[in-house]
Amino acid sequence: MKHSVQVEVGGRPMVFEAGEIARQAGGSVLMRYGDTVVLIAATKEDRIREGIDFVPLMVDYQEMSYAAGRIPGGFFRREIGRPSEKETLTSRLIDRPIRPLFPKKYCYETQVVATVLSVDMENEPDVVALTGASTALHISPVPFQGPVAAVRVGRINGSFAINPSAKELLESDLNVVVAGSRDAVVMVEGGADFVSEDDLVDAIDFGHKAILPILDAQDELQRRIAPVKEAPPEVVRNESLVQAVRDAAAAEMRAVMTTPEKHPRRDRKKALKERIQAELVSDDPDRPKQIDNILEDLEKEVVRRMMVEEGRRIDGRRFDEIRPINIQAGVLPRTHGSAVFTRGETQVLAVVTLGSSSDEQKIEALAGETFKSFMLHYNFPAFSVGEVRPLRGPGRREIGHGALAERSVKAVLPRDGEFPYTIRVVSEVLESNGSSSMATVCGSSLALMDAGVPITEPVGGIAMGLVKEGDKIIVLSDILGDEDHLGDMDFKVTGSERGITAIQMDVKIAGIDRGIMQRALEQARAGRIFILGKMKEVLSAPRPELSPYAPRVITIMINPEKIRDVIGPGGKVIRSIVAETGAKIDIEDSGKVVIMSPDGAACDKAVERIRGLTQEPEVGQLYMSRIVRVTDFGAFAEILPNIEGLIHISQLEHRRVRKVTDVVQEGDEVLVKVIEIDKDGRIRLSRKAALEKPEGGGQ
């Protein structure tokens, strides 16, 4: 039986349809928003997956080319291989707000698949897919503790807008996705053009209010379908074992969790675990796992109690204190720009490479083919956390962290046309103990300035945490990895002194109100300003010159009709220019020519050659010409490559000329002036206009 629920979102109907499509999935919903249609299906296995301590949830978002009336590229002409960066980022966007809503100890393999079936280029499918994922789980047997919903918030001409169109987003200084439940915001992700903390909180509030009717629609659909929900996994506590572990480990756990350094703390924690396992050994095969879980709960309790009752963090810092910062710029001799940013036990090497327009990244998406001239790639090798792992391509986490840093830095890059380079930044995480993505933002900003990229201002980032126990609220600046794991909210804020450029926030508990969010953002601003001050002590502005090893790029415009003259038959002309100068030359259909070479003189020589081939004659300009043909009524002269004009016999001399050959011969070089170009493009030249008139006149 088909069920349909409709709600207005952002002035347009959002339709939830279930019961007719993908009926063998545990729960499925067809979401319609404008002409954007997304199918979301949620399914779980019947068997428990043994031996895991995490929610076995897979979220896959896929965009089908047919949704936009396109056929995929490549030999196979089908969607195969790795998901695109956008698909990966959207999968993460869906995963983050729904994963915490699975019951504790949930051990059934569960998959959520969101498939874009139609897209209208105005209504982004990502927030539709996120809302649909919650709906599919809500109407399935899965004991999902939702629902949640999401909207995109923009600000156009000072007014907030829900789910602005693609065209409106171009004019918006804010682009954030807000996901929430009925009681609280659970996730915020997006970028901005230097908005204030107050404005950001207003935007989040605005988005949360728009979410409430969408949650009502999900509840109404669930009421109509009336799924039989499975009972959440029963959490059975062995109270005697809990007490035994606490008695044996509590005192030492506090000593362990006040060890400032990461690896000594890890080693002491491991030794404590091994001691407790040995003391409480049993024939019960589940005993080791039970002890591990009890120790994990004890660790969380000890750390949180230290903060609430003693005002003490794991490494002894104040709640708003930033770890020691060390910065080095220009550390690599042959790269175009580099910097090492170290904050506590987190260290990042950022390296900048400059290239030409041919180095831009081609993006094939539903909206069509586009090109990226700025890329930021984040690498997280195993050695950065003292582990051993095969080297593989970037995972979802690395792609997500790179996208956050890219969004943060993009706001300060020179605008199109101001800096004719493709820019790639690579962040190599060399050590990690929390906030490596924020160290990437700081290191990338420094490396760009070291490369001489004219960014408008430095950008810094800070990762914040929150602990809430009853009415006691603690906001933590520059969190460690353990603090991230044990806290109630994790959010990353980036920006300059002017305002925020990006935010990523995940809330793990209810009850985070506007006041708490405002306080956390203000403390984040203070930390960001402190970090920016440290950065400016080392490098306060972009270097005035590019690296001597960076390519020199010159961009010129030519008449598109002249492109064939530059390329020549079979590419003969352009190959000769490249061979002669050593420069790399890219020509676009618009007539834009980009010349690049490590040698500035080579660039200049290539420009001279191209200008010579494409220069247009101008009335009133003087040209050194070559006589190519003589007639009774005048001489034809070549003033530019393949461009000829007529010097009429009357324009050869100030005096009367009886015979053309009395003045010029074929092959002579003579200075001429363009005196007219008629509507048919014929050029009239004058030799006498280029000569000084003799004293006393002359005919």
Swiss-Prot record:
Q: Domain named S1 motif: which ranges?
A: 620-688
Gene Ontology cellular component list: cytosol
| One GO process term, biological-process aspect | mRNA catabolic process
Catalytic activity reported: RNA(n+1) + phosphate = RNA(n) + a ribonucleoside 5'-diphosphate
Please list the residues that bind Mg(2+): D484, D490
Name the coenzymes or cofactors required.
Mg(2+)
- EC numbers listed for it are 2.7.7.8
Residue ranges of domain KH in the record: 551-610
Q: Which InterPro entries match?
A: ExoRNase_PH_dom1 (IPR001247), ExoRNase_PH_dom2 (IPR015847), ExoRNase_PH_dom2_sf (IPR036345), KH_dom (IPR004087), KH_dom_type_1 (IPR004088), KH_dom_type_1_sf (IPR036612), NA-bd_OB-fold (IPR012340), PNPase (IPR012162)
What are the UniProt keywords, alphabetically?
A: Cytoplasm, Magnesium, Metal-binding, Nucleotidyltransferase, RNA-binding, Transferase
Task: State the protein's purpose.
Answer: Involved in mRNA degradation. Catalyzes the phosphorolysis of single-stranded polyribonucleotides processively in the 3'- to 5'-direction.
Q: Spell out the family assignment given in the record's similarity comment.
A: Belongs to the polyribonucleotide nucleotidyltransferase family.
Q: What is this protein called?
A: Polyribonucleotide nucleotidyltransferase
Report the source organism: Syntrophobacter fumaroxidans (strain DSM 10017 / MPOB)
Tell me what gene encodes this.
Answer: pnp
